[in-house]
Every structure is written in structure tokens, then in C-alpha cells.
Amino acid sequence: MAKVTMRQMLEAGVHFGHQTRYWNPKMGEYIFGARNKIHIVNLEKTLPMFNDALNFLGGIAAKKGTVLFVGTKRAAGDLVAQEAKRCGMPYVNHRWLGGMLTNFKTIKQSIKNLKDLEVQEQDGTFEKITKKEALMRSRQKAKLELSLGGIKDMRAMPDAIFIIDTGNEKIAIQEAKNLGIPVVGVVDTNNDPNGVDYVIPGNDDAVRAVSLYLSAAADAINEGKGSITTAVEGDEFVEEKAEA
């Protein structure tokens, strides 16, 4: 299963927390000390917790489950979309709309509207209506794509959510907890780890650190998916031998 190393985390700056005056005491057990008024995360604690989280995500993928990637702050958005697409998982990288999980029925209707508009744009409908109406529909489609494009193929509740910056995604965490959906999250020294099932203590601001979390998660998920193929091929091989 995909694993990260201490060297990778050091090079990515995972150990740099926030200014000491902003710390959350609940993160105290994961803090090694302070340097220049910046808390330093204890990577000896992060390493096994990060790898446990990766094993969990890979296990979900191995069972054909779904992991929803969530990271809506600007520094993470593009990377969230890139890595979620790489492992074929849904994502939210613009803004978390209240009810995305707890009111999924309504969200699915909005997704249907988005898909209808996509069809209209492709089948020439936009060319048959007035320019004003076509412009309105085009703007509506762009707005829906921004908010829902990453989850438009998500047909049911995810089996877990993977969050970059738990302090920025409190609504998503609360909705997941209300529905009993496990939460994997990067928790910096200024945030509250409560409500996160798989805590990854570390820097949630540095682009290199965010990239490491996301690429490692995508690798673990792809490996998990690969194990499905291997298992199926193994079963077929056994059946062929039995027939022979």
C-alpha cells in the first residue's frame, strides 16, 4: 500500500505549524516544540497517522467505495481537482454548499440541471434560442459547474471524505458526522481535531505539503483499485484451472 516517508514530509514542510499564539490546545500532543514563535509538528506522530489514513482510503477503494476530496481554499483548489481526477474520485474545491451531504436529494436536482444544460449546449439548443437566453443559460451552467462539477458523477453518499484544512471545512465535517461518514483530515496546530476520525497533524497551508497529502491519497486509492483487478484476475485463473 502507498506510504509516505519522513524525508518526504520534511521536504514538503509538513512540520511547520501556525504561530504559537494561534494554537489549539487540543493539538498539544502532536506538537514537538516551537521555533521563532512557530509551532513545530512532531512528525514521528504524524508519520504513522498519515499512513494509517492512507491504508484506510486504499481499503475503501479496494471495496469499490467512494472518497470525496474536499479543499476549498485557493491554495488547495487546483490540486484537489487534479488529484481527485487522477484517482477517479469526486471533489469539492470551490465552495461547500450547505446540505451537500445532508440534503443530497436537492443537490442531485441541481446536478441534473447542470447535465441538462451541458446537453443543450452540445446538441445545438443554445443556437436555437435568443442570444440573451443562451447567455443566461451559459452563465447558469458555469455557476453550477464551479460548485457541483466535481460531484456531478457522484450518485450516492461517499464512503469517506478527505479534507485539506479542517478549520476551513467545518460544515462539511459536521454534515459527515451527522450521517456517520468517516472523516480523514489534515489538522494544523491552530485547529480542532475533534470530529476527525483519521487525523493527519501537519501544515495545511504550504503548497508542497498540500500536494503531498493529496498525491499520497490518490496513490493509495489507485493502489486500492488495482487490488480489485488483481483479485478478479486471480479468481478467473482459479476457475480456468478448475475447468481444466
From Swiss-Prot:
GO molecular function annotation: structural constituent of ribosome
Xref: Gene3D superfamilies: Glucose-6-phosphate isomerase like protein, domain 1, Helix hairpin bin
Family: Belongs to the universal ribosomal protein uS2 family.
GO cellular component: cytosolic small ribosomal subunit
InterPro entries named in the record: Ribosomal_uS2, Ribosomal_uS2_bac/mit/plastid, Ribosomal_uS2_CS, Ribosomal_uS2_flav_dom_sf
Keywords: Ribonucleoprotein, Ribosomal protein
Family matches, as HAMAP family: Ribosomal_uS2_B (MF_00291_B)
Organism: Hydrogenovibrio crunogenus (strain DSM 25203 / XCL-2) (Thiomicrospira crunogena)
GO-annotated biological processes: translation
Protein name (record): Small ribosomal subunit protein uS2
